[in-house]
Amino acid sequence: METPSQRRATRSGAQASSTPLSPTRITRLQEKEDLQELNDRLAVYIDRVRSLETENAGLRLRITESEEVVSREVSGIKSAYEAELGDARKTLDSVAKERARLQLELSKVREEFKELKARNTKKEGDLMAAQARLKDLEALLNSKEAALSTALSEKRTLEGELHDLRGQVAKLEAALGEAKKQLQDEMLRRVDAENRLQTLKEELDFQKNIYSEELRETKRRHETRLVEIDNGKQREFESRLADALQDLRAQHEDQVEQYKKELEKTYSAKLDNARQSAERNSNLVGAAHEELQQSRIRIDSLSAQLSQLQKQLAAKEAKLRDLEDSLARERDTSRRLLADKEREMAEMRARMQQQLDEYQELLDIKLALDMEIHAYRKLLEGEEERLRLSPSPTSQRSRGRASSHSSQTQSGGSVTKKRKLESSESRSSFSQHARTSGRVAVEEVDEEGKFVRLRNKSNEDQSMGNWQIKRQNGDDPLLTYRFPPKFTLKAGQVVTIWAAGAGATHSPPADLVWKSQNTWGCGNSLRTALINSTGEEVAMRKLVRSVTMIEDDEDEDGDDLLHHHHGSHGSSSGDPAEYNLRSRTVLCGTCGQPADKASASSSGAQVGGSISSGSSASSVTVTRSYRSVGGSGGGSFGDNLVTRSYLLGNSRPRTQSPQNCSIM
């Protein structure tokens, strides 16, 4: 369906296409079309305004009905507010009295704390003196043990030398016996040779006698034969016989002479050998006698030294036993004194901690009550302003007190606010991750970079020569510590590697000091790795710091609560039936048990609140729930529940065990 403007545009276009128009005609037609378009837009706007006026009339009727419903509920709500305001005034008076009592108790606790601190300082001085005396005695014991070990090593050395000398004496005695035996053998051989020489001489004489006898017998036979031979040949035979006898005699004499020379030569050689052997044996026997004499002299001197060392060792052992007994008595006395002082210090610390915890608990409760009263006052003032109620003289006086209290709280030099709250607070925590693949684990890493502690978790000793500990702190340079070459960590033992700036004493194998490094480093990401001699990572521990910033100002909390209250009014189109009620619940930060301090007296109002105290940053968390009444509801409260949390800081650390919990 075409609109009038579209039809007019169609007709004008047709006319323009049929007949040519002048510029003035064209201008008038355009103005006419503009006026027609504006008239159409005005008609549409008037229709829209009429429809909006109709809707506005319906809305005014609904608002009138809602105001009538709310006006019927104002009386009940006013009575509930007045009852709760009376309870708040009573609570404020009791809190003021409790505050005065707590201030008196705080002064007493401070005096007791000063006295206990002075006594603790004195006890710590006595403890330091006892520890210094114990260290001196331990140093004396170490020196005596070193002297004893030196004497024992010298004794073992002398015993070894004595054993060697005894072995040498035994060898020399054996050599002397062998030399004597050889001398006796040589003497026997000499006597045997002399006997043989005598025998040979006798045999030679006997042979000479035999030869002479044979010669005479031969002569006699020849003579007998010569007698028988005829006289013609006697001369020939005699000459031949003489020649033969001469030849035979010459041969016998040559043989005897040769045999005699050989016998004399053999005898002379054997006699020379026997004489040389006897001389050698006599020289060996003399040297053996001299060595034996020297060995006996040395053995006597070593025996005298050994007896003297044994006497010294016995005296040292007796003195060592006396020193050990005295050291044991000193240790027992020091242990008893140290145990007594530690028990007294523990009792004093327990009493101080208990008093501080009680004071901290009371201070937290008082702080929560002050916040609740301040929030009540802000809410009541807002409701009175919204409902245009005239405040009673009592409420004016309480408002005056509240304003004076807020001015005191807002003053920069207020001691109470400085004690209660800090402008901001940071809470840091460490998360650890450890990994172990060998016998030794990284048990503990100091957050301030003072030490690194390792533990041998196995049942066997672990040699850690040339092992390394590598420390990485974010993007900082890598720190590397190398163990001594002969270091060994016993089974189940712990070794602590201290930085030079920690002030620890170097006492291996339990405590080692890294003298070239003042600190292990501290930061937000600490990674400590244990590397063995082959370069393999056998253990690791990583610390990551997380920091939480807490903004906690009492006035800001009250203002936020008041702004939330007025914002609720604005969002509900100024509904006078909207209000906030709450109750309070105090929770113990350690054991988690609730302690009911107040309850809401309004029927149908269900409000939750909690106060918890953290153990690390000692921050108080106040959680409140608000139930708001809707504008279209009947005589009951609304169903919209709003929960808000407030963080209040306290710079004093607080640790409390469940046994000392004031709530339990």
Swiss-Prot record:
The modification Cysteine methyl ester is found at residue 661. There is a cross-link at residue 201 (Glycyl lysine isopeptide (Lys-Gly) (interchain with G-Cter in SUMO)). The keyword Magnesium does not apply. GO terms for molecular function: structural constituent of cytoskeleton; structural constituent of nuclear lamina. GO terms for cellular component: intermediate filament; nuclear envelope; nuclear lamina; nuclear matrix; nucleoplasm; nucleus; site of double-strand break. The modification N-acetylmethionine is found at residue 1. It holds the Pfam family Filament. Residues 1-24, 384-442, 555-577, 598-620 are annotated as: Disordered. Residues 384-664 are annotated as: Tail. Residues 219-242 are annotated as: Linker 2. The record marks 266, 330 as: Heptad change of phase. GO terms for biological process: cellular senescence; DNA double-strand break attachment to nuclear envelope; heterochromatin formation; negative regulation of cardiac muscle hypertrophy in response to stress; nuclear envelope organization; nuclear migration; nuclear pore localization; protein localization to nuclear envelope. Belongs to the intermediate filament family. Homodimer of lamin A and lamin C. Lamin dimers then assemble into dimeric head-to-tail polymers. Ultimately, two head-to-tail polymers assemble laterally into a protofilament with a uniformly shaped rod of 3.5 nm in diameter. Interacts with lamin-associated polypeptides IA, IB and TMPO-alpha, RB1 and with emerin. Interacts with SREBF1, SREBF2, SUN2 and TMEM43. Interacts with TMEM201. Proteolytically processed isoform A interacts with NARF. Interacts with SUN1. Interacts with MLIP. Interacts with DMPK; may regulate nuclear envelope stability. This is Prelamin-A/C. It comes from Sus scrofa (Pig). The lineage of its organism: Eukaryota, Metazoa, Chordata, Craniata, Vertebrata.
